Amino acid sequence: MLILDVSNSSKAPPEIYNHLSYIERKLRSLNSDENKLYMNYRIGEELFILSSQPHYSILLAFYAKSLWPASDFPLKCSFHTVDDSYPEYNPDRWNHPSINAVRESLQTIKKSKVQDFSSPDMPKGIDIALMYATDIFRTVTPLQQEVMQYYLTGITQKEIAKLTNRSVSTISKHVHASRVKQLTEIIDYVIEQYELD
């Protein structure tokens, strides 16, 4: 499961909610028979997500963070995998005890300036890697973020240059400045630690 929440949302401008709706639409587009996703808002603007795939929620968190604009209102992500099957009945009624643990974990990072990811009993190595990922996501410019999004999908710098109407050297500069290569190492490390395919 994954809970996404906007930090300091009571002071956020209305366009923040447009970003959250955009992320929700992008995540919903990943729903399939092989990977079932359920999303609903709980407790205000908290986006609650269930996935039928174990540990998939951390990858969804990375995807959501890559779409979120750097701002004074960071998107906080708390994830956890439970040893339970995906609820085939109405998932809105699914009420597992670990939901509270995920919410409590989210509360520990609500005001954090260095961590936007949490999970109950998260190993120290993953915690440190996600602090670095937080710093990367929080410091990108809009162009760096766009380049990062393309790069993470496997598109070459030459293709990114065409898509963004920029030179290859400009894209190369923004790939370096966005630290997306370091981010891919973090993602690979997390995938390896959680034994994801």
Question: Residue spans of the language-model regions?
Answer:
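DNA-contacting interfaces and partner/effector-binding or oligomerization modules
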Residues: M1-I99, R103
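Flexible, glycine/charge-rich interdomain/linker segments that couple
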Residues: V82, E88-R93, T108-M131
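Regulatory/sensor and coupling segments of signal-transduction and defense proteins
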Residues: L106, K110, R138, V168
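Short helix-coil-helix linker/hinge
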Residues: F137-Q144
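Short alpha-helical "packing" element that flanks the helix-turn-helix/winged-helix DNA-binding module
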Residues: Q144-Y151
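Short alpha-helical "recognition helix" segments of helix-turn-helix
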Residues: T156-T164, I171
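DNA major-groove recognition helix of helix-turn-helix
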Residues: V175, Q182
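Short, basic, alpha-helical segments at the C-terminal edge of helix-turn-helix-like DNA-binding modules
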Residues: I187-D197
